[in-house]
Amino acid sequence: MGDRMAFRFDSGATWLNLLATRGTHFGEHPVERMPTVGRLVEWLDAVELRPVRKVSAADLELAWELREALRPVALATVDGVPPDSAQVKALGRFLDGESVSLKVTDRLVRTPPATATDALGRIARQAVDHLTGPEREFLSVCPEHDCRGVFSDPSGRRRWCPNPACATRGRVRAHRARKAQSE
């Protein structure tokens, strides 16, 4: 599997990493990094949210639905405008999941979600807390027109998302613009 299909876990939160499962979202050729149930299971494993019950094709559809409900709400939040009420309603449907229980083993752990729907509910709750709490001030959007990836930037110094390709393209474009001006 090529680099373009590799999951990204550098956006600053699990829900932001869910957004990154679709790369170059606004480009001509978006990259779906979670095209199958198996890839959804891999992703849920990586974020320690693998459900007890088997993940289905319907769960994959729900994961895509959550991701695409979150994206416009996150972009609106970063832009400082109210999100579309239909998207907020779509996101709200994921908030009715099971509650989280904790247990102590060699460390504090949460019990695994029973279903993929419960796992997605946990991700939605994290997103809502992030989007409505003080950490929303740390959210940024990649300026690359085909990316527009949302990421957390507590330092306030990052210009592009964590994807090195976006930063490289942006720097090359800026260099060419400076060079053209000096000629």
List each language-model region with its residue ranges.
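Basic DNA-binding region of bZIP-type proteins
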Residues: 165-182
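A structural preference for long, well-packed, hydrophobic secondary-structure segments
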Residues: 138-140, 157, 176
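Short helix-coil boundary/hinge micro-motifs
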Residues: 1-141, 148-152, 183
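Cysteine-rich micro-motifs
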Residues: 157-167
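Short, cysteine/histidine-rich loop/knuckle motifs that typically chelate Zn2+
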Residues: 141-146, 163-165
